[in-house]
Amino acid sequence: MFSGKQTKPTFKSYLPPLQTDLKKSPQLPIKKLEAKLLPGEIVVNEANFVRKCIGADSGQDDLWGKLVCTNFKVSFISHNSLPQQRFQCTHRLLGEHDIPLACVEQVVTVNDVKGKQKILGSNQKLKFNPTELILYCKDFRIIRFRFDEAGPESAKKVCLAIAHYSHPADPQLLFGFEYVGKRYHGSAGERVNGVDPGGGLQTPLFDCSSDWDREIKRTGASEWRVCTINQGYFISPSLPEFFVVPVSLADQDLKQYACCFYSQRIPLWCWNHPSGSALVRMSNISDPQQQRKVEQRISSAITKSHPLRSDVFKSDLDKNLPNIQDIQAALLKLRQICVIESFEESEEKWLSSLESSRWMEYVRTFLRHAVEVVYMLESRHVSVILLEKEDRDLSCVISSLVQLMCDPHCRSLHGFQALIQKEWVMAGHRFLDRCNHLKKSDKEELWNQYPAAFEFTEVYLTVLGDSMWVPVFSTFLFNCPRQRAEHSRDFASSKSIHLGQDQALRFPPVWDWSQQFSLKDQTLFNNPLYVGKIATCLQNGTVKTFTHRRSKKNYSSTVRGLPSLMRNGSLGPNDTLTRRNSLVLRLRSDLSQVREQPETPSERFVRDFFSRAVDLQGLLLPQLLPSHLSVWKLYFLRWVPEAQIPHGGPVTAFHKLSVLTDEIEMLQNQLRQYKGAAGTANTSHAEHSKMYFKATSTPQQCPAPPGYLSSSFPFSPVGNLCRPGILGTPLSKFLNGAKIWLSTETLANETI
């Protein structure tokens, strides 16, 4: 993203042919159009009389206005606006037609008169006057602007500015530095961990020893301690200043062994199982002569930390998982097939194209390996070391998945944010270089199979992914804590910013969601299905916790093999096909006879898990057969009109469950008021409700589903994928937007 070398084209354009009878600009009222700027944001270049393509080929829905490039975003200020929808969630940092520069993947300029096109990179020249600008975005949107009435020189300058500022060569050129320098300097003491005091649970940032101490106590890791030898980043440049190590390892030993590890990344404690088994991650040992000695010392220390003194299992991730280059190549192919060409043509080859991308295969591989690690911790009661050359990519994925499967705390909103902060941000994942996607897709698979076990929704995961392209948060802006500290100090020094008691600029974390959304909009993150420890119900006057019982029918989807009475795919002459439930029993009894290889202990562990009722506050294992995995449609296909279901999809169940949950909360409040509970008489239920969709004051009147609901809710594929905000769309807009995909043309195959 910030490398000096320009990346090769990664997108194909699937847009209608250029129009020869373009409409002229209508007679618009003269009014001053100004972009709304954030603190530290400045206008770099702009062009007037620009047409933004919205949907239909006729262009009747297109918008006219000013195209502005700032040091933060591409902003389009329109003379007129699309009809206001009944549903409107407002992003506090971005307007309706704003695109963060960090979200721009490619900038394509076109001159339809000369038949020229060019993919612009940073500091490149443009030898023709563009008549059209196409922006390919990392969130799968495609944005088109026409310069038919704009000045040729201003059109060229704004295109060059967008290409230049969307690919900065220095991280300090990111808008976040100017934003923090202007807005957050001098706010020390007013915020704690990026959250206003009194604002509820705070997400630990793990940048101090107290956060790690609390995590040790929470997991019961009594034989582990907080290590401070990396304060000032003197030992390892990519490790945090505070991390957890075995009690039996002295600081002097760690300093001595650090030089033997790749990038001096000594072993890091991740999590402790209730049995005492520990999950540890570490980089490879770079010194072959010291490898045996150091491995024995580390393994011995981890063994001593286990109450049963169990052995240590080493899991080599580099040998068992695809590398980061393969994952990025799969993501690139997935992007190309998600930007649908002709819907009729792509529908026929969708499954084969998806399979050839290998994306779902890689997702399944990561899930399977995480299950194997869970087996070692849960069934074998041994500690596990995750080995990776640099310990900054694959380890982040596996350690997070293991904790999501084993620890119900990580499936709460607060716990999940702490997990990402601990295993990705503080562990030194290269967000600046990678802008990784796999972590979200794997976790979405778990959410999809056990939605009632997670406090957050699919919308939350999608918005969290989109936040990577808003470069004002420390969470996804740097490769490691040291890089953040160094760049912050250098920027403050160059701008003569007095830091006071702070050692560096204090960037807000993404976990302070009030930076982006109102409290009402944040209720879209709350899952009405969540069965947590605090989710209780009243039954016969007593409080009972919600429980979940697994249907025995689900077992049939996990069984492998065929019944022994079937020969060459057919039944014997005297056999009949029994009911599904009895077929399951026959499959179970004959499973051992048809297996070519004996069942491994880990496979038996998985089979036993699915034969029992699932405890949503306990261990969760994912279904791993291909039929159980699915593409994350809300994230990858939300901007494709043909892929949407107006007034349908999972959101219809979400709406009804939200209303039902809100009604239960309302009745509970009324019951407490009836019993005379203190401080509840004047409490407004609507103000404190956790649900976005609320029940009516009279339970007899069930609210009808809103007309703006669709399977892409709360995102909107209006027109030419042009609306980035969380906006609703009526059916008419879907139909208008669908017309843009009927014709195709390739713009990115050639460069000039």
From Swiss-Prot:
Keywords carried by this UniProt record: Coiled coil
An annotated Gene Ontology molecular function: phosphatidylinositol-3-phosphate phosphatase activity
Stored Gene3D superfamilies: Pleckstrin-homology domain (PH domain)/Phosphotyrosine-binding domain (PTB)
Span of domain Myotubularin phosphatase: 206-636
InterPro entries registered for this protein in UniProt: MTMR10_PH-GRAM, MTMR12-like_C, Myotubularin, Myotubularin-like_Pase_dom, PH-like_dom_sf, Prot-tyrosine_phosphatase-like
Residue stretches in coiled coil: 652-683
A Gene Ontology term for the protein's cellular component: membrane
GO biological process: phosphatidylinositol dephosphorylation
Recorded family membership: Belongs to the protein-tyrosine phosphatase family. Non-receptor class myotubularin subfamily.
Name of the protein described by the UniProt record: Myotubularin-related protein 10
Organism: Danio rerio (Zebrafish)
